[in-house]
Every structure is written in C-alpha cells, then in structure tokens.
Amino acid sequence: MTVDLSPATLHARVVVDELIRNGMQEAVLCPGSRSTPLAFALAAAEAAGRLTLHVRVDERSAGFFALGLTAVSGTPVAVVCTSGSAVANLHPAAVEARFNHRQVVFLTANRPPEMEGVGAQQTIVQRGIFAHDVVDELILPAAGREVEAQADMQGWNAHWRAALCRIMARAAASAGPVHIDIPFREPLTPPVDGPVSPGDVAVPPTDEAFLPRCWQGRPAQRPWTEVCDTATVDLSLRTLVIAGQGSWELPALAGVPTLCEPGGRTFGVPLNPLCVPALLADPTTAPQQLVVVGKPTLHRSVTRLLADPTRPQIVVTAPTAPTEWADVAGQAQTACTNLTVTGESPQRWLAACAEADGTARAHVLDVLAGLRAGQRDADPGWLPSGLEVAYAVGEAVAADPTLLLFVGSSNPVRDLAVTHPDLGPHCWVNRGASGIDGNISTAMGLALHHPGPVVAFLGDLAALHDSGGLLVPTLENAPKNLTILVANDAGGGIFATLEQGAPAYEDQFERLFGVPHTADFEALAAGWGVAYQQCTLAELAGVLTSHAAQAGVRLVEVCTQRRHRHALAATLTGR
C-alpha cells in the first residue's frame, strides 16, 4: 500500500533509516512537539526490529545516558529532542562526549528558518549551539510544504542521505559527537492510516507504506555512501574517470578514459569535455560507472552526469582528508582513499571514447578557424576572442615542459579546458571557491619557487582585482621569470556565456554583468614598476616563448572582445 506522507514525516523517516544504515542501533528520545516526526519514525523502526528506543524525560540526563550506552556498545547512539532550550540542556553531555571520544549523535528538531528571529515560540538559533564540543554539525534543509515531482523527491533523498553519511563518517574518523539539526514544517504527525505506533504491524523500511520508492535507501540496507579505505573498480564495465582540481596520480587507473579539468591529472585517454553528450547519446557508448578524483567544478555537462542516479559512482578522496569527498549531487555510492581494479577496459569503449574525443577536438578547431576567417576579414576593428588566446596559451604550454601555467577562474580556465583538455599537471588553478581573488599573488608565489618560467593567464577583472599583488617590497625576493598574461575584454565576459548573456537580457546586460571599464594596464604596470607589453594574437606565441630572454615580472596584454561570447558558447556546446 502507498500512503501520502507529509514532508516532515518523510524527512524524519529518511533520517532514521539512513542513521541505522550507518551503524546506529540505539536512540534516546525526549518527548517534545517539534520532534514528533522523529519520535514516530524511531518507534516504527523499533517495531520493525531495527533499533532499540529508550525514552527519558530530561534532556540533560538523556545526553549522559546516551554517553553511557555508546561507551559500552562502541556504536553511535542518537539523542533526540525538541527545539529551544531543550537543545541547550544537551551541551554538558556534548562536552563529556568530546573529551571521551564517544559517537553521540545529538539529533535536534527545529522550527523552519523563517520562524527564527520573529518571536516564534520555542525558537532559538540552534546552529552552532555546541560550538567546539562537537566534531561536526549538519543543518539539514527543511523540506517544502509540498514535495511533488519525483525528480525533486529523488534529489532531496540523495542530498539528505549523502549528508548524513558524510557527518557519520566524520564522527567515526574523529571518534567524537556530532550535531544534526532538522527543521520540520507542520504537519508533524504521520497519517492515521499509516504505521504510526509500535502497536502497528512492523513495517520493513523497503515497504512503500513506510517510505515511497523514490525516498528509499540503497539495496541490502547499505549506507547511501559507503566509506572505506579501498574500493574495487571493475574496469570491464565502461568506466569514465572525472578528474577535477586537486586530483592526484592513481596508477590503478592508467589507461582509463578521463575527463580532466585544468590542474587535474589525466590517468589514461584524455577526453575533451565537449564529447560527453555524444557518448551519452548512444546507450552502447554511455559510461556504465564513474570514478571521481578531486573536485570537478567546470562543466555543466559533467555536473548533469554526476547528478544521474542510474550510474554507480566511486569517489576517491585524499588519504589526508578521508571525509572530504566531492559529491555535490549526493549520488556517490562509495567514498574511498585508494583503489584496486579488476578486468580491463573494453576495446570498443576505448575506441568510442577516442572517436568522440577526436570529433570534439576537430569541432573546436573548426570553430577557431571560423572565428579567424569570419571576423578578421570582415571587421576592421576585429579583436580576437578569449578562446583564441586560450588556444595560443595551450600550445605554448604543450611545447615547453618546463613552463608552469596558472589559470584564472571564469573564462580562461573554461576556454583552456576545451582547447587543451590534456595539460594536466602543467597547470595550477584556484578553483576551491572559484573566485578571482588573489590570482596575481598566487602566481607570484608559484613563480618564486618554480625553477622554470611561469605564465599566469587571467581575465582583465581578475588582474584588476589583485593588482596589488604586483607590489614586491624592495628588500624581498621577486620572481625571476613570471609573465602575467591579461586577456582584456573590458568587463565580465564569463557572464556572456551564461543564461544572463542571452539576447533577451541584452538591454540590461552591460550595466549589471558586463561592467565595461577603461582601465589602463600599461599605467597600472608602470605604477607597480612592472614591465609591460601589449601584443596581438599573431604575436602572442612568440611573446610566450621569449621567456628565456626575460627576467623578473612582466605584464602582457592582449585586447579581446566578448560581443559574441554567448553565441560562441552555444556553438561550442551545440546548444
């Protein structure tokens, strides 16, 4: 039977189900109103024989009772309470659990965020209430009043379960307490025609009366994301590696097709990201599983691929940060720090990847040729696009193994990703928060230690944003060979490639997003005592290879245009 469940009931049942899958065998409940959904979910789980539920009246006592339980059992124990000062009464137990390295899960109900700060009854700011006395804290987003579309349901389910697996992994890794705060919207009680009390017939968690199919967890009671030291990858399946920023060498993946972002590591056959739609269009060439290394951030086609729940994903994280795996969509089935492999990549899969990659690379070259032929001859005021500059930069890096390239966020890194998707370790990018902060300063630091030449490829706004990084005190060491290459399109060209760059918004685009300027980079360089050179696209290759004759820091400017960036992006991606 299928029963219509409120968002609060669904939320609570998903949380209880996933915590049990992550090793919770006992829970301590303090009666309260806002925690009603959790109370009924725990009772149903106990009736199904999945955990033992204890009830205590006082939250302070309940917290220490849970501490005693986990001290002997060695398994995580949850303490559940309502909102308000009830949560504060758990703090003494949190202090003791932290000092005793015990996995107590403080599971607190809360009012939805719109009720904070407006005088709502029994409502306090519960975020951060345990301060440094928990090893981690998770604020699960409140479900809406209505959750209707199945895709929305699957998205909520994946995010909730993945977040719970992550915080439980951190509790285990740090051997300490964690705080999970859950805002619930009314109605708080389950339907009367569903399993609501221990007196009902026990309902297994796979029964759709307990959780509809799209809200259920992994088969065989596995955690949504299994955390382990070593995972095994069967390469006889069509396996695609996605290597983002911070990825590192994994010899086991040698020879496996790889989508590698600038700054990542290519393990096998490097693929142009533009080939993803072609691979997915044919069921016989679509990847059957994904291995994610590092933090992928650049391509929307890859983001959509990672959000697909039908394709198993293994995420590899650094041994120094085993609980910091990248999984934005919450679809990873396994998170590990090392890999072993069985089988070999099918030759048909390798051939399909090579063909799709070759087609994508040829398409990029055709687009570049069209830009040169179509605009340069027809427009006396022609300026190159940033894509053409990126191609010249990529060619220079590919030709000189001693050269280290720093790539700025926004258009430079995206352009380089499609013109030269296999530069890998020759690049460095600051994509942690994808900002344009401190790009020149980062390049200065790289250049001070790198034994060869360094080129920083930046947009004009990134260069202006950190122009102060050009200042090196006279008594300090300056880089010996740094070229700061600025592709100057006089504004925010990245926005022209996004939705707001569509023709429908043209009348407001320049003021709100393009932000045109007339900054003088020659004067700026002179003010900081840095050598300056302006060059054309045709001259750029020679300028980039002239580093042997130069010393110190120089700023090279190539004037570009962004009038056709939206159309160019559409042409590249086939939108």
How would you name each of these model-derived features?
Residues 2-6, 144-151, 155, 294, ...:
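Phosphate/pyrophosphate-binding active-site segments
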Residues 12-16, 20, 33-38, 363-451:
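Active-site diphosphate/adenylate-binding microenvironment
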Residues 25-29, 50-54, 72-111, 288-294, ...:
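A short, small-residue-rich loop immediately preceding and capping a beta-strand
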Residues 29-33, 53-64, 79-85, 408-409, ...:
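Active-site nucleophile and cofactor-binding loops and adjacent substrate-binding regions
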Residues 71, 89, 224-235, 239-331, ...:
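Glycine-rich, anion-gripping cofactor-binding loops and their flanking helix/strand elements
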Residues 96-97, 103-110, 114-131, 144, ...:
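Thiamine diphosphate
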Residues 114-210:
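Internal gly/pro-rich beta-alpha loop/helix module
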Residues 128, 174-222, 543-575:
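Glycine/aspartate-rich loop-and-adjacent alpha/beta segment that forms the canonical ThDP
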